[in-house]
Amino acid sequence: MENKSVPVLLDGKIPAGPIEQKWDRRREELRLVNPANKRTYRVIVVGTGLAGASAAASLGELGYQVEAFCFQDSPRRAHSIAAQGGINAAKNYPNDGDSVLRLFRDTVKGGDFRAREANVYRLAQVSGAIIDQAVAQGVPLARDYAGYLDNRSFGGALVSRTFYARGQSGQQLLLGAYQAMMRQVGAGTVRLHPRTEMLDLVVVDGAARGITVRDLLTGKIESHAADAVCLCTGGYTNVFFLSTNAQGCNVTAAWRACKRGAHFANPCFTQIHPTCIPASGEHQSKLTLMSESLRNDGRVWVPLRAGDTRAPGAIPEGDRDYLLERKYPSYGNLAPRDISSRAAKEVCDEGRGVGPGGRGVYLDFAAAIGRLGAATIRGRYGNLFEMYECITGENAYTVPMRIYPAPHYAMGGLWVDYHLESTIPGLFVLGEANFSDHGANRLGASALMQGLADGYFVIPYTIAHHLAQTRPGAVTAAHPAFAASRLEVESTTKRLLGIGGRRTITDFHRALGQIMWEHVGMTRSAASCREALARIPALRAEFWEDVRVVGSGGTLNRELERAGRVADFLEFAELLARDALYRDESCGGHFRSEHQLPDGEAKRDDARFCHVAAWEWRGPEQEPRVHIEPLSFETLPLATRNYK
């Protein structure tokens, strides 16, 4: 099943010169649009989470005509709202040695040297401005006793650089971006389309010129034309069925763009988050994240011996294994997510896991409560403790939390160059929907940073460069490509409704998730990837023969929405497994069991795989073709990650 085609080299359009000057130089080189002409250009923004709302707000403020789409009832329901722990920025307020260069180094190292250096440095460079923007918007970031902005630590760093709003950081930052966007809605520069789902990208003469959508209330299929399109639609880890993502999170917009010519980069780079509430049974439809910030004060441990079923309070210190402190003494409980997740799986596989099925480890706050008092811990994490008790019925102030790794974030995404432009001219991809900044493993508190960096501080410059070379309104929705797109979407809708099978959509999604978790999950191998590649097409064929989609297409129909998303997951999952088989190394969250160092850590193969693998869709009857973008590391030389 390995891909045998000759790879084509992709140009990331990386600026020349020293890394600290690249972004400043490029901004000076980019073409501009006359302020009086900006209102003649129309930009579509799909998705209104942190990346989408900040992009729509920024572009509207500049004077462009923006059409913003989201499938939620309100932009405030975007999944960015679920981010808990915080946002990184190189402000060095604690005076503990942080800098732009150190944030850059930590991020590249955390991603196991599989991210583009120039993009990561730019991210670190603009991080401080994000905090200034948020404060100016009134985002209630935590402050210390003196009134200064407070910081806490996160995984993979030896400094405190994470700004936060208790355990609701994503929600508060999203409200700031949302208010900025709604200001532009009021000003008339942004037009909002809620309850509207993108189902196709319209490409005319090789360039992105609009989208086709379905009104989720009426079922009406419509097309919208624009001079550029920004996809800000998040990640795809719901391909595993059970994940920390909201049930509505999907790959549909990105996958439909891929099928129109946008290459999909590194889809096998998926993050398994170490601190989630363990699954309680097969009836479950999603998992709940417990913020990484909890590991500032919580200690991860399991019984020292297999089969020890005593209550946690009855197990003395000498019979406990504080596994992260033992394995990674320099970083302790704040080791990066990929290695922390594998460490938890390792002890559970040894029979030392806790809770039902032995699939859990303890996250214990007793020492911190004894040192600081329960009131201090409540002030830092109160809403998280309340959430945990609501779900489990257990009081984490008196007994340790039980946690276990779960699918959480997608480092892979649509390939973009330094301008955030995909392989389709005019299609820009922001936030988690692109691949660019996190390599093979994202550090905690960096997702919010990337989404807002892309939306507030990158896309306003780079999209202008594209638009300055485009005649406004050159293509309208009257072009035949839009009618063809609508016809194709309507045909797929009718096909789904006409199957009339016996199995539910959830049944197929759960079956796909089991294949993915078992064969392409936390640990993979060539054999397991091949098994997934054999089973996914068979399941997909069953779906199109035996799924039952009730209702009609001319009204609100949640089953129809879910059926289309699962159909896309059934196609995308095959690409993810193929990429995992192709990447014959271990790096970050992509852990191939054949490739381990003697101590069990990931063993990279820089000679063969120090590159981005971007996949070109060639139709349902042909294997996708891989294209590569070589990665060079000049500022931070390649090295084996070491958190010990």
Model regions: which residues?
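An anion/pyrophosphate-binding glycine-rich loop and adjacent beta-alpha core
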Residues: 256, 262-390, 461-465
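Short beta-strand "acidic-cap" motif of Rossmann-like dinucleotide-binding folds
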Residues: 65-70, 266
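Glycine-rich Rossmann-fold phosphate-binding loop(s) that bind the pyrophosphate
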Residues: 47-50
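Conserved N-terminal glycine-rich FAD pyrophosphate-binding loop of Rossmann-like flavoproteins
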Residues: 72-105, 271-275, 282-286
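Glycine-rich loop(s) and the adjacent beta-strand/alpha-helix scaffold that form part
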Residues: 228-283, 287, 355, 438-461
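Glycine- and aromatic-enriched mobile tails/lids
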Residues: 24-25, 30-42, 55-58, 62-64, ...
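Core beta-strand elements of the Rossmann-like FAD/NAD(P) dinucleotide-binding domain
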Residues: 39-41, 219-228, 423
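Conserved redox-cofactor binding core of oxidoreductases
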Residues: 133-220, 232, 276-289
